[in-house]
Amino acid sequence: MNKDAWYQYFTECEAVTDRNAELVEEKFKECEAYTEKALKKKYPECGVVFTRHAEAIKAGYFTIWIDTGSVTHKNIKLEDCGIKPVELYDYPIRPDYF
């Protein structure tokens, strides 16, 4: 096992993880902006759900809450809003893969 190769691998993994998290947060902000601009007209009392938002955005949707006396939730596809799906970076190949 090459110690330097593993160090480089884990450093690259950390960088990819951080960058992917930034991309998801940028996409989440787009979803919040779309909700404020378009969905508030149809659902005056609504907002974007933060819980598990990263998994949802990676899967191509986001969830809003709607309060009409009782709170309900609705999944909104990114493509239906004109928001491009998030394109995440691939992780590096493990040094012991070959």
Q: Where is each model-derived feature located?
A:
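Extreme N-terminal leader/activation tails
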Residues: 1-9
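Acidic, low-complexity, intrinsically disordered interaction modules
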Residues: 18-98
